[in-house]
Amino acid sequence: MSESRQGYKRHGARYKARRRAVDILFEAESRDVDPVAIIDDRKTLSNAVDPVVAPVAEYTEAIINGVAVELDTIDDLLSEHIADTWLLERLPSVDRAVLRVACWEMLYNPDVPVTTAVVEAVEIASQYSTDKAGAYINATLDNMASKVDELRERAANPGAVSGSDAPVAPWDDSEELPAEDEAEDSRP
């Protein structure tokens, strides 16, 4: 390999779709809007006569729609498997987005090998987040990967994952969260 290509990694269409899905989930949480609405806006803008944004890949749309539909289950399972010293809500938004994309792929997309979902998530986190993000994202997803069949079964059964303590999506205005001083929180 030539010297100029050392360190160069090829990234296929799915990697780019995952990365765009992370961008959109991050934006949705930051702006407090529905990520599916962002997809719709991007599709409209990309279909204009003089497009101002790149077209949305089908796989990006599948990820966003899947995460939006399964968000409560995904967040419940992530909360169960994240390190005891962390709360999902307290992680940086970009890390939550990366974890949600990878979790959706692991549980709901049998076409993606679990190892691929984990490796790609760690790589995206290393590009977008802090130096330490890759390690705890890898640990969380490896923990989930070790029992992926059980988790897929739980995810397929709506009653198998507790929904009562599930965090409300930032774009879901149907429920009001308690004020910060009213919320019970025993972990950092």
UniProtKB/Swiss-Prot annotation:
One example of a Gene Ontology biological process annotation: transcription antitermination
Entry-linked InterPro entries: NusB-like_sf, NusB_fam, NusB_RsmB_TIM44
Pfam families registered for this protein in UniProt: NusB
Any one Gene Ontology cellular component term annotated for this protein: cytosol
This protein's record includes keyword Transcription regulation: yes
Chain positions covered by the region annotation Disordered: 154-188
Keyword RNA-binding recorded: yes
Start-end of Acidic residues biased regions: 172-188
GO molecular function: RNA binding
PANTHER family cross-referenced by the UniProt entry: ANTITERMINATION NUSB DOMAIN-CONTAINING PROTEIN, N UTILIZATION SUBSTANCE PROTEIN B-RELATED
Similarity annotation: Belongs to the NusB family.
Function according to Swiss-Prot or TrEMBL: Involved in transcription antitermination. Required for transcription of ribosomal RNA (rRNA) genes. Binds specifically to the boxA antiterminator sequence of the ribosomal RNA (rrn) operons.
NCBIfam families hit by this protein: nusB
Name of the protein in its database record: Transcription antitermination protein NusB
